[in-house]
């Protein structure tokens, strides 16, 4: 279990990384933690200067990580940018930094805490910055799933593979049961490794990345995959369906990438003749199949860097990154548009804004530790084991 700690507040940890407003939640609070009363106003004209001053005062004691999906107002203060795993490794490579300020979401901060030393303190500027996909698989649900696999007589044949976008509890379960973690960049290698260890894979929490990797990269058929729904008895599957399947996909998805549809692809091709469609593998299978290129955020960035002048691109990933890339490459005569007509931000990622970052940096500069993300030792040990298996992948 993970605790989020604020020295000045006596709060109880919540079981999920994100307590959605509307589910018996107080709109004046964030995941059971009172909103800081001295949070700066978004209209404060001195926010940039305040953030810069606090960061300079902290010096080498602080290391700010910025995920690709963050707002520009936050990214400008990041010491490094990248995807979740790259940032966690970047944090581990800076042992002199006492504070790791992770401008991302909860599971990312957990991963950074797992990979950094016990002396380092990982901080999340807004505790409500969770991940709906990571929250789609709880430890209790996954344990129940394993019981279902055991009753079907196949648990010993199953190797769990968990996406980096999962909670520390799920990573720990994966490590404890002989599995590995994967990213969107190395999912193919992770699955190949898993099938060398066992006959079947339980892939969680993102069904789309699992399906796309199995079918597109490993040459499986859609019939080789079944979807386990944690909200239905026995996952909505019969014992025979489980025994016949090679890939058991958890019924989870990214709310951002799940919005893209085949209509989105067809529409942009009609509007922009000659456009290259480049999407993230968290998109639905039919979208990935219709795209010209598929890859992680790092792949998307590198593909656009290498693209020739005059080329046209429709990108299926989070809007903050797409806008940033469009602005960056406009001078090189590369036309870059968002794949869908509908604006599609990651709402929880966008909870990290400049006021929260300023409040965090100023609090740390004043000697007050806020919003610490800390994974307990047992969970950390098994989660780290799963991460180390990933690092050792051929």
UniProtKB/Swiss-Prot annotation:
GO terms for molecular function: 4 iron, 4 sulfur cluster binding; metal ion binding; quinolinate synthetase A activity. [4Fe-4S] cluster binds at residues 131, 254, 346. One of its GO terms (biological process) is 'de novo' NAD biosynthetic process from L-aspartate. Keywords: 4Fe-4S, Cytoplasm, Iron, Iron-sulfur, Metal-binding, Pyridine nucleotide biosynthesis, Transferase. Its EC number is 2.5.1.72. Iminosuccinate binds at residues 67, 84, 163-165, 184, 280-282, 297. It is an enzyme of class 2 (transferase). Pathway: Cofactor biosynthesis; NAD(+) biosynthesis; quinolinate from iminoaspartate: step 1/1. It catalyses: iminosuccinate + dihydroxyacetone phosphate = quinolinate + phosphate + 2 H2O + H(+). GO terms for cellular component: cytosol. Its main location: cytoplasm. Binds 1 [4Fe-4S] cluster per subunit. Catalyzes the condensation of iminoaspartate with dihydroxyacetone phosphate to form quinolinate. HAMAP family: NadA_type3. Belongs to the quinolinate synthase family. Type 3 subfamily. This is Quinolinate synthase. It comes from Streptomyces coelicolor (strain ATCC BAA-471 / A3(2) / M145).
